[in-house]
Amino acid sequence: MSTILKASAASFALLSLGHTISGREWTSDKVFKNIKGSRSWACGTVGWYQGSAFLFISGILHYQWSRDPSLLQDPLNKAIAAIINVLLWVSSSWYVKNGVTPSAVACGFSAALQGFAVLKEIL
């Protein structure tokens, strides 16, 4: 079992929880409530919670990899790990650009941890 991949899995579970809580905060903002019922409101809300589910699923996947790190030798699993890492770094950069520092730090930390964990197992 890989402890570092297990730590990465835990970081995704925490990201998912934080993402969900953050969604509850910004969807209660007066500006956002003013567009309730619009397409932007519907897509923004469902998309946000789909993101939370994606982060949770990523945590489960990383937990599976922690139980059997040899799975990361498969090219498809490598590709999935790479896409997840790029997504985290891009999200972190987007949050920095838009002044959402706590989310930027959380995504950046998880990206670094995930990248290190995966590289440690495949190199």
What are these regions (language model features)?
Residues 32-40:
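Perimembrane loop-to-helix junctions flanking transmembrane segments
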Residues 87-106, 116-123:
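Membrane-helix boundary connector in multi-pass membrane proteins
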Residues 1-13:
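Interfacial segments of alpha-helical transmembrane regions
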Residues 22-32, 64-71, 98-101, 120-123:
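Juxtamembrane transmembrane-helix termini
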Residues 61, 65-98:
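Portal/gating segments that form or line small-molecule/metal binding sites
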